[in-house]
A protein has these predicted regions:
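GNAT-family acyltransferases
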Residues: 1-101, 105-108, 122-132, 140-144, ...
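Glycine-rich acyl-CoA binding loop
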Residues: 114-117, 128
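Short, surface-exposed alpha-helical segments at coil->helix boundaries
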Residues: 117, 144-147
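Conserved active-site tyrosine of GNAT-family acetyltransferases
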Residues: 150
Length: 175
């Protein structure tokens, strides 16, 4: 298993089996990773199609663990099972320029508590250690919470709008 640890989170890289469970059976996925069952899954901005996309790509790229999906787990106490606070994804391996896109989503009750920053920081560090030269995030141009999270981790608004209402933020690897 590929697991990254932050101060409060364990980021579990999905392999094909876990990605397929997440796309096919929420209950089986929660049981497989031994977390509390969440009534709403996946969190925005992810949709079921994104879960199927990750499972499909991992089926064709079994060595791609880490590039297609991560489960974000927080331990809220010794007696309680871990909580699945959100998911994140690097949208495939880096392109020819070394760019890779990052997306993350947290369940509403976990937003505004620093989990997004921990996730983004850990995944950007992992991506750079594994060949990426720049991590890009696209977000709703009006989403000040996500923009604040990205800025705290060192991302900068590129001032590009790849689509109407969408802002592009980027973080480059240290030279």
């Amino acid at each position: 298993l590929l697991i990254l640890s932050t101060g409060r989170l364990a980021l579990l890289a999905l392999d094909h089996e876990l990605a397929a469970l997440q796309a096919g059976s929420r209950t089986a996925f929660f049981n497989a990773i031994a977390v509390t069952h969440e009534p709403v899954w996946p969190p925005a901005p992810f949709e079921p199609g994104a879960l199927e996309w990750a499972a499909s790509h991992l089926a064709h790229d079994p060595e791609g663990q880490g590039w297609y999906g991560w489960a974000l787990l927080a331990n809220e106490g010794e007696r309680a099972p871990p909580r699945l606070v959100g998911i994140a994804a690097l949208i495939g391996r880096p392109d020819d320029d070394g760019d890779v896109e990052l997306a993350f989503g947290l369940l509403p009750e976990f937003r505004g508590r620093g989990y997004g920053g921990e996730t983004v920081g850990a995944l950007a560090t992992w991506a750079f250690a594994n060949g990426a030269r720049r991590v890009i995030a696209h977000l709703d141009a009006e989403d000040s919470g996500a923009a604040h999270t990205l800025a705290r981790v060192g991302f900068a608004d590129t001032r590009e709008q790849p689509y109407p209402g969408v802002a592009r933020w980027a973080l480059s690897a240290a030279a």
